[in-house]
């Protein structure tokens, strides 16, 4: 091979020509690359079972029909509960129970809420999910983001589903003449649901009250999931049921587990019956309005066409060129899964229930959206940065929704889900998301009110212990401020995740860093200085004897145990070797704590050579990119490509752990493009190994950013040289501004590492925290 510089100069004319050439428009639907069932089975990746157990070995995704960040995830159901950690659908199951308007935190281990399930039947009426469940095969399924269908052989029904954000339309084709039924459950595990049949207006209405988990577990959230179902066909009978007991001609039923409604109608062979449904978190009228506004007709194919066009436009925000079909499937499947959350929470007229109480009903300004379900411990890392990059207006609305939560509840939430405080997981990462948005130039949210909220979390403890126990404020903030770390003596009792003192310290230090960057931009000098000092608190839990994170007592002594490779109560969901790398704000300071770059690299190497890297959980997600900071970006390129090939498979068991609201998938989107936001709240992305011949990002401001990787392949994973907008480029990072102002970045890829490219200290990401 020629020397890299000579090779680069030789290719400059080709690079310039490529930058001016646009790929031919593909006639292949981008939806055709997506199987929405990826992540619904136990993991089959190479590290499956090494770290995670039970539901941690599943992607915990669902094959949902939805609009990007829509309200409802319309999914087939094989599990009939809303209980924690049980997804509505698993690929292992062979019995179909119906269609659900799910509010599952996709890819997580939390709970569904406010849902209902409807099921078409033929011949015999069976009401409970267990009794009516009918065999199906995965070969008979078609599962895309805009359309789902399945054949139910026992019922001889072809069942199809498509929809919009808050509504859905179903088409059932009956293979034989006779009686047919529609059975509906309000899915209240607490036995608090209600349902009624309105034969005059041909509607079924009901509601399912929502309950909290984590802080305030089991308490009412103050609002319900209201649903409406409309049918066209004349019915011959209707009634209610409670488990196996039928109540013919009864118009409503409330309270108690296992309740529901049914209607009966006669069908001819091959007759198609169309049913519509919608939901609302406000009231019955909201559900009706949502259905009327989104699907005012009975044309199934028209709705399918509308949703297909929405998805095609959304996915085309990133165009890729590659001859590798599997790579396209993995990429667009990841982009689909990164488009679930946060979810739209308001009705079409802008109404939504108040945060943390459910009342009063609030009213948004026209054109605005209120979002909910922020799995923030996961998603601030890559999902929110991806939204901020591709859809900054939507990202701003998501941040303003956090501001509304502060205004309505009194505190910025930690992990806002089911429109409630939870204090689930650790850290204070709404700060990270808000800071990342503002630092990257997003301005369509109230930064002054946001700063007030963030600062309150960082400096104040709730005056009311009841509020604290209810999930408001940072856990163990008093200890953190007193010691500069959270000592082992503070067990953090008022939290779902107790203890985990070291992980909390590391995460608070990062959050303080991000808040400091916002303070600097807002000229809050005193806050900036104090928070910048606190951002170095990570040093207080790195044991100088080992260079690994370690538990520390109130008297300043570290634990004597030095096994950095075993799970421990002071670490969140992992071992010290995993969390040691959680210093995204100051990798250079971490090098100093470890004894210099050589020891830093040795420890980083061991994460991969000793199989300690755990991609199935978030604390490791930035680890592979941290070689860049030590001037060895070729190791980042190697590690990231290895993770992409081994931890993601285009199969039902294709995720190595919980997708966690799209974080796992957002990681893949960034990695496949060749850059990653190691430290959200800064404008820098670490470069990795671009995997496509061409990728085009269509920025919301009208600009396009093209990434061209000559000779990219599964073997040619190493950057030999790079050019940005016609000029040689040696930095191993790129800025947010470089991308959004548009341009072209060209890489020359090879099968051997160029250890000189990006290796100089001046080519590494800037050190911000001095």
Where would I find each of the regions flagged by the language model?
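Accessory carbohydrate-recognition regions in carbohydrate-active enzymes
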Residues: 24-384, 388-432, 438-506, 514-540, ...
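ATP-dependent phospho-/nucleotidyl transfer catalytic cores
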Residues: 511
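Bacterial N-terminal signal peptides that target proteins for export
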Residues: 1-8
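Beta-strand-rich recognition domains
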Residues: 706-711
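C-terminal motif of bacterial Sec signal peptides marking the signal peptidase cleavage site
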Residues: 18-19
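Extracellular attachment/recognition segments
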Residues: 718
